[in-house]
């Protein structure tokens, strides 16, 4: 079974996003990752991965205590399912300004584990003015942030016994497939 975890953008969603997120005007739409000023390594196109269900974490940052760091290994693609993209819907002002965040401590721990990518089902690992600097900080450490994933609940619910697999189509647009 294959599970598509990319967000499909409708014309209405693109219009709404452009009205609520200035970066949407320059291709910062839908499921994507920002290469920042780095080169995306080809070996990153196939990685083991894990999806952590952190959907019960509300009104605070997602922290290191919310996941089992022992399950995270070097070069892994680590995803976080919050349900926010399904609950709020993509493109609203709230979607871009009140989304969940990963704590700086958790991000540092993931960088220390030398993961290759971090995926989230919301607009960014940090909000507002911290968003772009954290994406750059992670990229400087060889880690790319994949934003606006959807359907991660299907991956969590599928109880995958084998590692998550995915395929990157381009550096600007991402189509992630997980093998179950």
Regions found by a protein language model. Name each.
Residues 1-180:
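Active-/binding-site microenvironments in catalytic and ligand-binding cores
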């Amino acid at each position: 079974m294959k599970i598509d975890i990319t967000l499909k953008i409708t014309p209405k969603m693109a219009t709404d996003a452009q009205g609520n997120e200035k970066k949407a005007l320059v291709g910062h739409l839908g499921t994507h990752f920002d290469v920042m000023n780095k080169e995306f390594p080809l070996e990153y196109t196939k990685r083991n991965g894990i999806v952590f269900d952190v959907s019960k974490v509300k009104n605070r940052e997602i922290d290191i205590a919310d996941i089992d760091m022992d399950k995270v290994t070097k070069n892994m693609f680590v995803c976080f399912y919050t349900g926010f993209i399904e609950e709020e819907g993509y493109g609203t002002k709230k979607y871009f300004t009140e989304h969940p965040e990963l704590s700086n401590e958790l991000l540092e721990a993931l960088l220390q584990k030398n993961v290759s990518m971090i995926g989230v089902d919301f607009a960014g690992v940090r909000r507002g003015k911290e968003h772009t600097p954290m994406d750059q900080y992670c990229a400087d450490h060889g880690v790319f942030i994949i934003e606006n994933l959807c359907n991660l609940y299907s991956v969590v619910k599928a109880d995958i016994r084998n590692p998550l697999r995915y395929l990157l189509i381009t550096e600007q647009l991402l189509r992630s497939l997980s093998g179950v």
